[in-house]
């Protein structure tokens, strides 16, 4: 494909247009008086969102060079979302201001490399100050942070606070849609562990990049699976039952993984696989815990058990399993509650019997995972559009609250950034010209979140900042008053601000030091089928279907192994393997 090239100031200006295009759409979503963004969908009703990352992902610009700028700032939002779970709009606003100020100075003759160095020096100073201002989160502050992060919705803040209180900060809290009008909190059996799907091709929700299995059967084994020969009998039973299927094994690789992906994507099996957590003996112990939670039998080599002898009765089950790229959450049925309780009591006895502090800690971690359960926040609303909106709000609020527990909080509303901005003045005065300019870019950017919060609430941002400095108080955009934001419970998670700053400086500095931009030249739209007349029947010849190996017809033994030319196992119709005809 032919490429379009853009150089020097021309390329940077085009990239800036893309940055502004996205940032101007995103920044209306910050603060308690934030506005919403409505997004058209080809199928179904439109989405109404107030999440910066979601808005940024939807934007495509016709100019290919400007679109690169749009994608760069979208990367800021998505990276901050991935790392902190919140703060995407703040990161976007910071990036836009840094890019705008940086390009002004480059046009005036400043060195992009020196600006970058100055920005990095300024960032290090800001992060050090931010850490020193951070305070630990406890008690009622948890509800305050959750409420602020939910746009001032006290109901959401209360529900998240209750969930945190019940399952603790290490517990599992899931958000799902409800059939009722009310948003409710439900505590159920379950656990999570730090392992994600073996392949992204198992994802069932492309937008959220997660795999969800409803009422699945679960195979749990401490063996490594590289070929599916031994699993053919149980896969046949699963296919007949129509149940979703999860394989939890020491590892699943090679031909076995390829075959599962093939059958998943062809609709033959609703399947996913996950590697077992931990290592060595602790891995086996963790698998035993999961087996008890799900009512499964652990297929172990130590017990001389082989995969080819597995029956449907050896499998576990769950209400729901949610798998991300690095985490798996199991929501169990209540019928294993007594077994889980007995397992927890056994583990407590093991803690009393060991003198090793390390072993005690590890066993206590297992107890916490088994006994903690899963908190389900069931989101209710009158319409599907409202439900999606509330669900996003709750997820952002939950992530922000977890971040606040991790690294503490600072007074919100941008007040802390304004205070640090003033501190940067002394640093910039002792630096060389271009280095000082880079530091000043950070200084100016730190004021921008407060300006936008004020603007969204109908106030003049410059006036608000001047009053904050004069009164030495924060601005409550909800009430329009200047007050002690810590006492008012308007708090921002330190982790969210830290990551927003780091991500914004990273992308802004890269963009400012860009000299050449290369993008594909869009190809013209192909002519409509059937030629100029638009005859819908034109060009329909050649409806052969080569390359469809692996989709054997029912009863034809379609589950043949690679290279067997369609010679499948008897009765295994429809489940194709690589290399089949």
Swiss-Prot record:
InterPro entries: Chaperonin_Cpn60_CS, Cpn60/GroEL, Cpn60/GroEL/TCP-1, GroEL-like_apical_dom_sf, GROEL-like_equatorial_sf, TCP-1-like_intermed_sf. GO terms for cellular component: cytoplasm. It is an enzyme of class 5 (isomerase). One of its GO terms (biological process) is protein refolding. It catalyses: ATP + H2O + a folded polypeptide = ADP + phosphate + an unfolded polypeptide. Residues 531-543 have a biased composition (Gly residues). Residues 522-543 are annotated as: Disordered. ATP binds at residues 29-32, 86-90, 413, 492. GO terms for molecular function: ATP binding; ATP-dependent protein folding chaperone; isomerase activity; unfolded protein binding. Its EC number is 5.6.1.7. It comes from the Bacteria. Keywords: ATP-binding, Chaperone, Cytoplasm, Isomerase, Nucleotide-binding. It is found in: Cytoplasm. Belongs to the chaperonin (HSP60) family. PANTHER family: 60 KDA HEAT SHOCK PROTEIN, MITOCHONDRIAL. Forms a cylinder of 14 subunits composed of two heptameric rings stacked back-to-back. Interacts with the co-chaperonin GroES. Together with its co-chaperonin GroES, plays an essential role in assisting protein folding. The GroEL-GroES system forms a nano-cage that allows encapsulation of the non-native substrate proteins and provides a physical environment optimized to promote and accelerate protein folding. This is Chaperonin GroEL 1. The lineage of its organism: Bacteria, Bacillati, Cyanobacteriota, Cyanophyceae, Synechococcales.
